Structure formats: structure tokens, C-alpha cells
Amino acid sequence: MAAAAAATAAAKGNGGGGGRAGAGDASGTRKKKGPGPLATAYLVIYNVVMTAGWLVIAVGLVRAYLAKGSYHSLYYSIEKPLKFFQTGALLEILHCAIGIVPSSVVLTSFQVMSRVFLIWAVTHSVKEVQSEDSVLLFVIAWTITEIIRYSFYTFSLLNHLPYLIKWARYTLFIVLYPMGVSGELLTIYAALPFVRQAGLYSISLPNKYNFSFDYYAFLILIMISYIPIFPQLYFHMIHQRRKILSHTEEHKKFE
């Protein structure tokens, strides 16, 4: 669900309602009141740091590939910064909760927690999947997406958004979104036999709480949930792309 959740930011006309870390209406169709000066300064710093963090991950991947001459098991070269910066996105829930970013707390929580779940409850917890190529697949998709997304928010907050970044934000998802979803699904699928064998995070009866939980079945349900969500969200994003970029082109004609 991580790519699907993160992509909802782009599906709304302004990349998440100005939301997850940005401000303003990226479509340019109407102006929204942004955060105050102090909040804006903080958000700019936050987005710059997050952009830099994902750039560190990108550079780490490239350096590891050049050193090894292979793309296998590159996850280990960027494991720590990936965990740090993806977990750092939890601050975006706080941004919404205190009102400095005009996005839904519930939607933002879903977006952020789905990725944190995949990082910690799947990839970190099931060591055997960390060398899978599918992990690299979603890591690359996330990395490119986040560099663009945080750059987009930074320039939007500064009221100086280059068209190239706007175009990249509303175009590259066409490839990155399916790529990320594929990596996520394959990683969860690869984790299933190990989760079942170890009984990871599962609670069986009898116990004093009279409660049971099957983590293996839970992961299967998560995978099934991609079926209705992915196509609906993907085509909605395509529709939003046409609307937003066509508006930009029309605006340029009148300048």
C-alpha cells in the first residue's frame, strides 16, 4: 500500500493538498492561505533536509553499485538513511495535526504509516527479504519520487516552482508508481513463507486476552487491497496530470 498511499498526494490537484509538507494550490486555479512566516521557514527547512536525505540515499545506491558492479543486495548500503528519513516523514502527520499544512490527518497518517510499515514490519523484520531485488525496486521508485516531491514542496513554499519540477512530479509517477507497487507486492510476497514459518507477530489462542492475530493472513489481505486501489488511483492521477499540466500550458500562453 505504500506506493498507493504516497501517490494520493499527487492524485489531489496539488500533491496532497499542499499537504504532506507543502503549501498552496499547485494547480494554480485558486489561491489558498498558506502557513505563517515561522511555519513557512520551518517547512522550507524540513523539505530541504528531506530532499537532501533522499539525495544521500540516491548517491549511496549509485556508489554501492559502482563499487560492487552489481545491483544485488544494494539495500544494505542505504538501510540506515532509508529507515531514518522514511521514519522522519512521521513529522508530516504532526504538521497536519497542528494545522501548518492543510491536509487531512487521517489521509496523511495512512500515507506515511504504510511506508513505515513496509520498512519496519516487513523489510526490517524479515531479514531474508532484504537481499531481494524487489526491495531495490521500491527503494529506487521511492527515492526518485521523494526527491521530486520534497523539491516540489520547497519551491512551492518559496513561490518559485520551476516548470521542470512540476512536470516531473505529475509525469514520472506514470512509471514510478507501478514500479513501486510491483516492488512492494513482490517484497511482501517474498516475506510470506518466513512470516508463516516463524509465526512472526502472530498471536494464537488460548491466551488471557482471548484474542488471536495472524500476521501472515494480514499481509495477504494487504496484498489483496492493492487490486481495487491501484487502478482507481492510477487513472485518477492520470486525469489530474492532464488537468494540472494543461492549465499550466494555458497560463503560459497568456503571459
Swiss-Prot record:
Q: What class of enzyme is it?
A: lyase
Which parts of the sequence are annotated with region: May be involved in interaction with TECR?
199-215
Can you tell me which residues form the catalytic site?
Answer: Y177, E184
**Membrane topology annotation:** Multi-pass membrane protein
Enzyme Commission number(s) from the entry:
4.2.1.134
Cytoplasmic side of membrane: 3-42, 99-108, 148-170, 237-255
Which biological process, per GO, is one annotated for this protein? sphingolipid biosynthetic process
Q: Name one GO molecular function term.
A: enzyme binding
Compositional bias (Gly residues): 13-22
- Specify the pathway: Lipid metabolism; fatty acid biosynthesis
Principal cellular location given in the protein's record = endoplasmic reticulum
Q: Keywords in alphabetical order, please.
A: Endoplasmic reticulum, Fatty acid biosynthesis, Fatty acid metabolism, Glycoprotein, Lipid biosynthesis, Lipid metabolism, Lyase, Membrane, Transmembrane, Transmembrane helix
| Transmembrane parts of this sequence | 43-61, 81-98, 109-126, 132-147, 171-188, 219-236
Q: Please give the residues the UniProt entry marks as glycosylated.
A: N210
Note down the stretches annotated as region Disordered: 11-34
* Reactions this protein catalyses: a very-long-chain (3R)-3-hydroxyacyl-CoA = a very-long-chain (2E)-enoyl-CoA + H2O; (3R)-hydroxyhexadecanoyl-CoA = (2E)-hexadecenoyl-CoA + H2O; (3R)-hydroxyoctadecanoyl-CoA = (2E)-octadecenoyl-CoA + H2O; (3R)-hydroxyeicosanoyl-CoA = (2E)-eicosenoyl-CoA + H2O
Role of this protein: Catalyzes the third of the very long-chain fatty acids (VLCFA) elongation four-step cycle (condensation, reduction, dehydration, and reduction). This endoplasmic reticulum-elongation process is characterized by the addition of two carbons to the lipid chain through each cycle. This enzyme catalyzes the dehydration of the 3-hydroxyacyl-CoA intermediate into trans-2,3-enoyl-CoA, within each cycle of elongation. Therefore, it participates in the production of various VLCFAs involved in multiple biological processes as precursors of membrane lipids and lipid mediators.
Q: How does it assemble?
A: May interact with enzymes of the ELO family (including ELOVL1); with those enzymes that mediate condensation, the first of the four steps of the reaction cycle responsible for fatty acids elongation, may be part of a larger fatty acids elongase complex. Interacts with BCAP31. Interacts (via the third lumenal loop) with TECR.
Similarity annotation: Belongs to the very long-chain fatty acids dehydratase HACD family.
This protein's name: Very-long-chain (3R)-3-hydroxyacyl-CoA dehydratase 2
Organism annotation: Pongo abelii (Sumatran orangutan)
This protein's gene is called HACD2
